[in-house]
A protein has these predicted regions:
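Conserved residues at the C-terminal ends of beta-strands
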Residues: 51, 139, 198
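Surface-exposed, charge/polar-rich loops and edge strands
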Residues: 1-5, 19, 121-127, 131-136, ...
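Short glycine-rich anion-binding loops that position phosphate/pyrophosphate groups of nucleotides
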Residues: 54-56, 141-145
């Protein structure tokens, strides 16, 4: 099965989970993320990147709220316009969002839309340099026991993750139903060191 076929099959399987099961599994995954967060030294200001769930993805919103309550700065991906992406060599950046400001962040409401730098209030939603992240929660479509990750095919995280500090905790999250025997990979595909599933 090639990547496109696997992607369709696993998304269909994920979509078939009923809403209550998805909510319960998302809550269990968020609880495990909070446990991990609590084990990290929070003496210094810390920053975690999460994502806004789309469709039937694991929803990390409860984890983001818990991180903010613990004093962590929370950042979300913002897709870049073609001009901005060409200028920086990346298709996305991370922008900090205050806990009470998530509903006003257009890149949270529209996570796949590309925004020009001038579209976003950078004083309200500042860009967080990749090397400033202490933890990042990565969405995925499918995964296997080796940590291989299948995303949506855009390569955004495969290009972004190498820019992180070696100390950054990288965690993929998924439902158990997204586990497969083997994820086909190419040279640019990165394995995730940690995947939490339920």
């Amino acid at each position: 099965m090639d990547k496109a076929e696997l992607r369709r099959a696993v998304i269909s399987r994920r979509d078939a989970l009923d809403l209550d099961a998805r909510a319960a599994k998302s809550a269990a995954i968020c609880a495990r993320l909070v446990e991990l967060l609590d084990r990290l030294d929070a003496a210094a200001p810390r920053t975690v990147a999460v994502y806004a769930a789309m469709g039937s993805e694991v929803d990390p919103a409860a984890f983001a709220a818990a991180a903010a309550k613990r004093g962590w700065r929370v950042a979300y991906p913002c897709m870049l316009s073609a001009i901005d992406a060409a200028a920086c060599g990346q298709r996305m950046c991370m922008r900090a969002v205050a806990a009470d400001d998530t509903s006003a962040a257009p890149f949270i409401a529209h996570p796949t839309r590309a925004f020009a730098a001038t579209d976003i209030d950078s004083s309200r939603f500042p860009i967080v340099p990749a090397e400033a992240l202490d933890m990042i929660v990565v969405p995925l479509v499918a995964f296997d026991c080796t940590g291989a990750r299948l995303g949506y095919g855009g390569g955004c995280y495969d290009r972004y993750l190498p820019m992180l500090s070696p100390a950054c905790q990288i965690i993929g999250i998924a439902f158990d139903e997204q586990r497969v025997d083997h994820v086909p990979t190419d040279a640019h595909d990165l394995q995730l060191p940690h995947i939490i599933s339920a």
